[in-house]
């Protein structure tokens, strides 16, 4: 593992369960579920039957979902500062997020990094982590530029809390993590998954990692 993964995360990794499901999951309202995080220990990822390792990259839902859900695991283990929720407090819209914000641009201009981030402060927090580490510095700046004079200050204020939390609580520098994630995403299509050694991948210490 890269050094950034092991800093302060030993206990989290030891108890983490990664559960992979081939099909999609759906909520009672018909919304598709890409992943879930439970009790600070279990991540479930769905629709793996449709994952093509030759085309997966940092912009696909899989990379973002993994970091989104692991962000929840971290928050469930050690909560983030309560002042984060105050920045966009009255603007969270729960399950109406995709109805109210039909485009990423409209969400950005309201101060949310994605439409889904407007659901609740917990989703907002982990969406900032997931999108930051899966986008280049140039792409992130483009999003902030789109957010404009109203949305940008809110996103930047929230991200400062996110970044400080990750560094002070878990000793993870998000800039360093982003470099690793983008590198791995670029390498993913060239990996030979058929030749993975079962002896290496089935051991408890490797279970649930993203190598």
Q: What do the PLM-derived regions correspond to, one by one?
A:
Residues 2-13:
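Single conserved hydrophobic/aromatic residue that forms the stacking wall/gate
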Residues 10-11, 35-37:
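A generic structural signal for short, solvent-exposed coil/turn residues
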Residues 11, 15-16, 30:
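Intrinsically disordered low-complexity regions specifically enriched for long asparagine
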Residues 16-22:
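Extended hydrophobic secondary-structure segments that form protein cores and membrane-embedded regions
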Residues 23, 27-28, 34-36, 42-159, ...:
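Active-site-flanking segments in enzyme catalytic domains
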């Amino acid at each position: 593992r890269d050094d950034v993964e092991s800093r302060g995360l030993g206990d989290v990794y030891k108890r983490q369960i990664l559960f992979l499901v081939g099909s999609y999951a759906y909520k009672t309202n018909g919304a598709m579920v890409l992943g879930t995080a439970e009790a600070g220990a279990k991540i479930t990822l769905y629709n793996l039957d449709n994952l093509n390792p030759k085309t997966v990259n940092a912009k696909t839902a899989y990379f973002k979902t993994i970091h989104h859900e692991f962000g929840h695991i971290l928050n469930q283990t050690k909560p983030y500062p309560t002042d984060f929720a105050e920045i966009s407090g009255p603007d969270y819209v729960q399950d109406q997020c995709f109805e109210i914000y039909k485009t990423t641009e409209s969400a950005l201009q309201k101060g949310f990094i994605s439409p889904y981030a407007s659901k609740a402060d917990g989703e907002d927090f982990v969406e900032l982590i997931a999108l930051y580490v899966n986008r280049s510095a140039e792409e992130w700046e483009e999003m902030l530029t789109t957010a404009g004079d109203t949305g940008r200050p809110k996103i930047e204020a929230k991200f400062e809390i996110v970044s400080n939390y990750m560094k002070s609580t878990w000793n993870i520098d998000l800039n360093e993590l982003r470099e690793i994630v983008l590198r791995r995403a670029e390498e993913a299509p060239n990996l030979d998954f058929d030749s993975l050694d079962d002896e290496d991948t089935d051991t408890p210490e490797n279970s649930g990692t993203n190598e």
